[in-house]
C-alpha cells in the first residue's frame, strides 16, 4: 500500500497539509541533476527529511516539484500546501512562473485563489473586531448596538474558499483557549467548525454536495492525532508514538464514522 496524504505530521513536530489549487497549480518538468519530487510524494518527502519549517525552506530551495501522476487512474492533484511547526508556518505554491514560498502569519489555508490574494483581501476586513462597535458613522446620529457580536458585522458567511479563509483567520486570531490540552483540543475543533461544510449547502454536481469529511489536529509533542468525521462529532484519538515508529509496514486505523452518543440515563 502507498498512502496518499491529505495531511500528515512527523515525530519531530513538523506538520503539512495539501488543499485544492485547481487552475493555478502548474508543476515543473523533470530536470536532470535536480532532486525531482512528484506531487504525490511531496508530503512524505518533506516530513521524512525535515524537523522544522526552517529546514523545510532549505529543502524546498533544492527540490523540483513535478507533475508525474500516481497512476493512469489518479492524475496529479492540483494543490497548494501549508507547512507548520510550533513556531511558524509557510505556504507553498507551484505555479506557471515557478515555486513560491510565503510566510503564513495567520497559520491557516483554504483552497483557491493564490495565497497572496487571500492575504491581501484581509485588508477589506480591517474594521472587524471581537469588541462591540462604536458609532463612527456620524456624530449627528444616535445608533444602538442592539446585539452582541456586531463588531464582526461584515465577516463573510458563505462557503467560498475566500470567505472561509477570512472567517477561519478571524476566528483563529481572536480565539482564546484554556491552558489544558483538552481545552486546546476543544477550541481547535470549534475554530475549524466556523468553516464546516454541511451536506446540501454546496452543490458540486446534480445531487452531490461538498461536505467536511473529517477535521483533525495533532499534539506534535506527544504524537497524538485527534479527529472528527462528518458522521461522528465525538473526538477520536490515535497515539502515534504508541506505535513502532520504525515499523516497515503501514499501520492503518479505520475512520470512526457512526455518531457516538453519550446516554445519560
Where do the protein language model's features map onto the residues?
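Short, surface-exposed beta-strand-loop junctions and turns on beta-sheet-rich folds
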Residues: 22-24, 97-100, 107-108, 231-235
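Proteins synthesized as precursors that undergo proteolytic processing into mature forms
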Residues: 33-69, 75, 181-190
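Hydrophobic residues embedded in beta-strands of well-ordered beta-sheets
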Residues: 15, 89-90, 99, 223-225
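A contiguous strand-loop segment
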Residues: 1-34, 62-63, 67, 252-254, ...
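Structural recognition of the beta-strand scaffold that forms the well-ordered cores
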Residues: 15-18, 82-84, 91, 217
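Catalytic cofactor-binding cores of redox enzymes
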Residues: 62-100
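C-terminus-biased signal that marks the final domain/tail of proteins
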Residues: 69, 76-77, 86-88, 109-265
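Beta-strand residues in well-ordered beta-sheet regions across diverse protein folds
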Residues: 17-19, 93, 226-228
Amino acid at each position: 500500500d502507498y498512502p496518499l496524504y491529505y495531511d500528515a505530521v512527523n515525530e519531530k513536530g513538523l506538520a503539512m497539509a495539501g488543499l485544492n489549487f485547481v487552475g493555478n497549480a502548474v508543476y515543473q518538468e523533470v530536470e536532470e541533476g535536480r532532486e525531482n519530487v512528484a506531487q504525490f510524494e511531496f508530503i512524505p518527502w518533506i516530513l521524512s527529511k525535515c524537523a522544522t519549517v526552517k529546514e523545510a525552506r532549505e529543502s524546498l530551495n533544492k527540490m523540483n516539484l513535478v507533475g508525474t501522476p500516481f497512476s493512469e487512474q489518479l492524475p496529479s492533484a492540483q494543490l497548494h500546501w501549508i507547512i507548520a511547526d510550533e513556531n511558524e508556518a509557510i505556504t507553498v505554491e507551484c505555479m506557471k512562473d515557478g515555486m513560491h514560498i510565503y510566510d503564513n502569519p495567520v497559520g491557516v489555508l483554504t483552497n483557491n485563489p493564490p495565497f497572496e490574494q487571500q492575504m491581501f483581501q484581509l485588508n477589506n476586513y480591517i474594521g472587524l473586531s471581537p469588541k462591540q462597535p462604536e458609532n463612527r458613522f456620524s456624530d449627528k446620529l444616535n445608533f444602538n448596538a442592539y446585539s452582541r457580536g456586531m463588531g464582526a458585522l461584515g465577516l463573510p458567511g458563505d462557503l467560498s474558499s475566500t470567505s472561509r479563509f477570512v472567517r477561519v483567520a478571524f476566528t483563529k486570531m481572536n480565539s482564546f483557549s484554556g491552558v489544558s490540552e483538552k481545552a486546546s483540543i476543544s477550541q481547535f475543533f470549534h475554530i475549524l467548525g466556523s468553516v464546516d461544510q454541511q451536506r446540501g449547502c454546496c452543490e458540486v454536481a446534480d445531487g452531490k454536495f461538498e461536505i467536511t469529511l473529517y477535521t483533525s489536529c495533532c499534539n506534535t509533542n506527544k504524537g497524538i492525532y485527534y479527529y472528527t468525521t462528518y458522521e461522528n462529532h465525538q473526538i477520536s484519538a490515535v497515539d502515534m508514538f504508541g506505535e513502532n515508529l520504525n515499523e516497515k509496514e503501514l499501520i492503518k486505523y479505520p475512520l470512526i464514522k457512526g455518531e457516538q452518543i453519550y446516554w445519560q440515563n
